Amino acid sequence: MPQQLSPINIETKKAISNARLKPLDIHYNESKPTTIQNTGKLVRINFKGGYISGGFLPNEYVLSSLHIYWGKEDDYGSNHLIDVYKYSGEINLVHWNKKKYSSYEEAKKHDDGLIIISIFLQVSDHKNVYFQKIVNQLDSIRSANTSAPFDSVFYLDNLLPSTLDYFTYLGTTIKHSADAVWIIFPTPINIHSDQLSKFRTLLSSSNHDGKPYYITENYRNPYKLNDDTQVYYSGEIIRAATTSPARENYFMRWLSDLRETCFSYYQKYIEGNKTFAIIAIVFVFILTAILFLMSRRYSREKQN
């Protein structure tokens, strides 16, 4: 069977419970960021120290690096989806099997060599003081293909979500250069819009007429699941916590996109086919009303 490419959309109703998926032992208290890089495509932080064990892992996996992904807007930017819901961004923590292999390069040649932990970012009304430690370093790597010492005290434990139940599946690295076991925490961490927008000011390695682009987005779209790909989860809490709001938010975004399409048709045909333009603007008003009612209902549910 073909290799399962990453990222994917995780359908919570199809995920399989597995009694072997015990809580992970996360030992980031000794991890220290050494350098931060603008690779021209993403932000990468290299680490010394720190490892994960326990759960279903056969031994310790050493932390190597952290990668950050985002989108043009705050309402999308994660690589992985939960029930077709995209979060504002995603952090990937890359680990390798140091006990079994002599180096990261050797480990990535094997399907048990790499473990990648995924943490979702969700824009909220409050700044994340721990995530700000990363944001404060971005001015030193604004140009593409630059790196700088990470010159701030930073504790990676503080970026872990409040709930550590997880999904897992065998996929690939985002570049598809190696197999990797993914561990995905569906509970996001909250950050502020201003913090995420700072990443969009970084310069890309791509250019047009000699002028560099900004890295306004760098997330990847999900790949279709292979017939033999299995996604497992570690607890019932995941299913209850992710299904309803994720689908509702996605549906609201879809309605909003449809409204914008109808409005663009109205602007396009108002001087020509007035009948078509009137139909389009009627749909705009209808969709606006539906979105307003859904937004009020969703706000009441969050308050309750």
Curated annotation (Swiss-Prot):
Intravirion side: 295-304
Virion surface side: 1-275
Inducing or repressing factors: Expressed in the late phase of the viral replicative cycle.
Superkingdom of origin: Viruses
Pfam families linked to this entry: Carb_anhydrase (PF00194)
Domain Alpha-carbonic anhydrase as annotated: residue spans: 1-235
Subcellular location: Virion membrane
Record keywords, A-Z: Disulfide bond, Host-virus interaction, Late protein, Membrane, Transmembrane, Transmembrane helix, Viral attachment to host cell, Viral envelope protein, Virion, Virus entry into host cell
GO biological process, one term: virion attachment to host cell
Family that this chain belongs to: Belongs to the alpha-carbonic anhydrase family.
Protein name (Swiss-Prot/TrEMBL): Cell surface-binding protein OPG105
Taxonomic source organism: Vaccinia virus (strain Copenhagen) (VACV)
